[in-house]
């Protein structure tokens, strides 16, 4: 084999080949036959003894680390509504009626019939449309979600995934979006529920280690790292980067809980009023990595991300 052919084959082996598998209720993404994540587009029924109203769809679980470890948790005993990697809001209003796709009391996200996917050696792209609907009328959309997820090949120490989430009011009335009003904590937005069986959790932001729980934080990124296997020293983790186009960037709406929760909460504790036809877009990069935040050099990965956005 000549040197050029050897180099080309090495690059392809490093980049990997992406493929999707559709099992009739979820999409499983693989790179070189190694699972990356599973996206649930059909409603997932709760396991016993979780109450039936917690059925949900439109979220990622399991999300896998670079060495095949499961990073996420679904239906955790302490918060039944937490679900892998997801986005949802609790104390929102459709007109004057509460619509809760967070606790899932009277409404939930449903995937519409259009699901597009493409895959090659350089990236995998998942494009889909969901909507929020009340349980009493599941076909009548209130809020439309247009989602694009771009997954890049695993590198030596990390994998990057870009999320673009566009929300449009498709109802006849106003929608008021906000985070949780309970104690004005502001829960709601782009959320990651780590596997709590693997704690303790180490949170790191641009300002350094975050030792206590936080309901707001001045940082454009946050990392959470935790043992690959409970009780052992080897770590893996996940970082969330805010895109510079995020409204209010850098947005302080971070929620960090050491029981096992990382949220980029937007609009956090402020109301966001949407008239019919109004829309907004949230963009994030998710980085899965081996080791701690420091070992993966997450600050440098964030700076490279910012540089790339500025050059576009």
Q: Could you describe each region identified by the protein language model?
A:
Residues 1-13:
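Sec-dependent N-terminal signal peptides
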Residues 14-81, 178-180, 291-293, 299:
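Beta-strand-rich N-terminal accessory domains
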Residues 33, 128-130, 163, 169, ...:
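Short, hydrophobic/aromatic-enriched beta-strand segments in well-ordered soluble domains
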Residues 39-45, 51-53, 154-202:
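Acidic (Asp/Glu-rich), glycine- and aromatic
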Residues 174-246:
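Active-site/ligand-binding surface loops and adjacent short beta/alpha elements
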């Amino acid at each position: 084999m000549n040197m050029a052919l050897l180099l080309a084959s090495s690059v392809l082996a490093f980049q990997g080949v992406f493929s999707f598998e559709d099992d009739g209720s979820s999409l499983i993404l693989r790179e070189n036959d190694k699972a990356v994540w599973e996206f649930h587009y059909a409603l997932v029924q709760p396991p016993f003894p979780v109450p039936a109203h917690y059925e949900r769809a439109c979220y990622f679980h399991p999300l896998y680390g670079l060495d095949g470890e499961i990073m996420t948790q679904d239906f955790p005993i302490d918060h039944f509504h937490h679900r892998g990697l997801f986005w949802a809001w609790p104390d929102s209003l459709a007109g004057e009626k509460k619509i809760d796709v967070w606790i899932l009391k009277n409404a939930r996200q449903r995937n519409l019939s259009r699901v597009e996917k493409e895959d090659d050696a350089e990236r995998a792209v998942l494009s889909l449309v969901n909507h929020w609907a009340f349980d009493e009328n599941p076909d009548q959309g209130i809020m439309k979600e247009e989602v694009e997820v771009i997954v890049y090949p695993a590198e030596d120490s990390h994998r990057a995934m870009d999320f673009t989430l566009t929300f449009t009011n498709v109802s006849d009335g106003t929608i008021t979006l906000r985070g949780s009003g309970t104690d004005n904590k502001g829960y709601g937005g782009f959320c990651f529920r780590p596997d709590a069986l693997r704690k303790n959790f180490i949170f790191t932001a641009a300002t350094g280690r975050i030792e206590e729980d936080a309901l707001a934080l001045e940082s454009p990124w946050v990392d959470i790292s935790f043992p690959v296997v409970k009780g052992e020293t080897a770590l893996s983790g996940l970082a969330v980067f805010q895109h510079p186009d995020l409204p209010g960037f850098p947005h302080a709406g971070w929620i960090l809980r050491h029981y096992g929760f990382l949220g980029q909460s937007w609009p956090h504790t402020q109301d966001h009023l949407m008239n019919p036809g109004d829309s907004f877009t949230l963009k994030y990069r998710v980085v899965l990595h081996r080791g701690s935040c420091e070992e993966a050099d997450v600050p440098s990965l964030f700076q490279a991300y910012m540089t790339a956005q500025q050059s576009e």
